[in-house]
């Protein structure tokens, strides 16, 4: 399916690895010009940058000044904004172990980074009378988990923000949607210091056992791949989804078992 994204100008946050990198790779392959915001780059992202279609802007998007700095270097035209930056620290010590500093850091990264990046990018979209905003949310927005309590709260806030914004800017040609993955085969879950390893350290179970147990809760029996999330994001960014706004798309292998 040709998504007709060639020549579009896109901004992706958190694009150095995992889901974000897959989105950047997909947009570039479709012919879009992509500005990527990340705190640090990666070998894979640097390789994409050498193609000339991808520009990397190093910015701490959890810092209040980071999003405006990124958008300020993205050019005058922004057709697509993908708010992807985020993190889900596992809180194996329970609610009482989560400090004010933990809450603040999680909300800054998982909610306010998207709010601020959207605030910075939206004027250009409104001036053009067109634009697409897709934010990476999470199944934890509707399945709050005590092991990622602060993350669940932040993602619920992100879902509410995007739904409310879609009602405000939809009449002005801007579409706003969210994508909510379940466990994805990325470093956030499976890498050094990821969820599986953190839970392993707290419980004594091997990291692979933790990951296998999580996968068994999904109807498909496996984690979602980053490229599968990216494919969904690219579809929503395209004109094929021109009458879709204010919607949340779950991609979780059947983890959520309710309607």
Report the location of each language-model feature:
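Short, small/polar-rich loop/turn modules that mediate ligand/substrate recognition or access, typified
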Residues: 170, 175, 244-246
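Short C-terminal tail/terminal secondary-structure segment
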Residues: 92, 143, 222, 233-234, ...
């Amino acid at each position: 399916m040709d998504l007709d994204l060639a020549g579009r100008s896109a901004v992706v946050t958190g694009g150095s690895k995992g889901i974000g990198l897959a989105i950047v790779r997909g947009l570039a392959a479709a012919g879009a010009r992509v500005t990527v915001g990340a705190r640090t780059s990666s070998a894979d992202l640097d390789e994409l940058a050498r193609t000339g279609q991808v520009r990397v802007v190093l910015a701490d998007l959890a810092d209040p000044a980071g999003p405006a700095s990124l958008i300020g270097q993205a050019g005058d035209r922004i057709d697509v904004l993908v708010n992807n930056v985020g993190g889900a620290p596992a809180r194996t010590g329970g609610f009482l172990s989560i400090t004010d500093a933990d809450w603040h850091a999680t909300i800054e990264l998982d909610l306010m980074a998207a709010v601020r990046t959207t605030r910075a990018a939206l004027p250009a979209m409104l001036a053009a009378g067109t634009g697409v905003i897709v934010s990476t949310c999470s199944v934890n927005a509707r399945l709050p988990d005590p092991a990622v309590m602060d993350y669940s709260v932040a993602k619920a806030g992100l879902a509410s923000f995007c739904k409310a914004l879609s009602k405000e800017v939809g009449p002005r040609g801007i579409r706003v949607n969210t994508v909510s993955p379940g466990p994805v085969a990325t470093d956030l879950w499976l890498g050094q210091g990821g969820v599986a390893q953190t839970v392993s350290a707290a419980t004594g179970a091997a990291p692979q056992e933790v990951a296998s147990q999580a996968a068994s809760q999904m109807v498909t029996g496996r984690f979602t791949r980053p490229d599968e999330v990216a494919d969904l994001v690219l579809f929503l960014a395209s004109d094929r989804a021109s009458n879709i706004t204010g919607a949340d798309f779950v991609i979780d292998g059947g983890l959520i078992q309710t309607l």
